[in-house]
Curated annotation (Swiss-Prot):
Subcellular location: Cytoplasm
CDD domains associated with the record: RRF (cd00520)
BP term (GO), one: translation
The protein, known as: Ribosome-recycling factor
Keywords from the named record: Cytoplasm, Protein biosynthesis
Similarity remark: Belongs to the RRF family.
Length: 185
């Protein structure tokens, strides 16, 4: 019973860390990375479709993405979708390839993205703490129902706290890495 609670807490905390990684991937740094375009939706025959389903996104060099659109009639729609996204990118079409140069980040945008990264990290920390609270409440309920002793509850609570500390430490490391990436000129 105790192990199930700890395992569930660990899995949920792992998912929180994974979600933070996805959130950080969407925050643009000065470098080109295909995940930057993950949020772009293209109007494909009347339906909004993720860009990844209508084009192959590759990194041409450290500051340029290259898109190979599968359906040549979709080139204009893909270009428009990238321009109208809130990413601040200006694609350039060269034949059947769309190149997306990454503009250099200004100091102001770097600070804005750093602030956004900190907010995402804080949200992840709060989520991990909520998972800890849920796990501790489940342990307390077990102890009240006399399914486990007070000592077992205390030991399991300490284990949950260690797990929480470990995941919050990983969140801090991820945030430091993202901030360093953002501040690198």
């Amino acid at each position: 019973m105790i192990n199930e609670i700890k395992k569930e807490a660990q899995e949920r905390m792992g998912k929180t860390l994974e979600a933070l990684g996805h959130a950080f991937a969407k925050i643009r740094t000065g470098r080109a990375h295909p995940s930057i375009l993950d949020s772009v939706m293209v109007s494909y025959y009347g339906a909004d479709t993720p860009l990844r389903q209508v084009a192959n996104v590759t990194v041409e060099d450290s500051r340029t993405l290259a898109l190979a659109v599968f359906d040549k009639s979709m080139i204009q729609a893909v270009e428009k979708a990238i321009m109208t996204s809130d990413l601040g990118l200006n694609p350039a079409t060269a034949g059947t390839t769309i190149r997306v140069p990454m503009p250099a980040l200004t100091e102001e945008t770097r600070k804005g993205y750093t602030k956004q990264a900190r907010a995402e990290a804080e949200q992840a920390r709060v989520s991990v703490r909520n998972i800890r609270r849920d796990a501790l409440a489940q342990l307390k309920d077990l102890q009240k129902e006399k399914e486990i002793s007070e000592d077992e509850e205390r030991r399991a609570g300490d284990d949950v706290q260690k797990l929480t500390d470990k995941f919050i430490g990983e969140i801090e490391k991820a945030l430091e890495a993202k901030e360093a990436d953002l501040m690198a000129v």
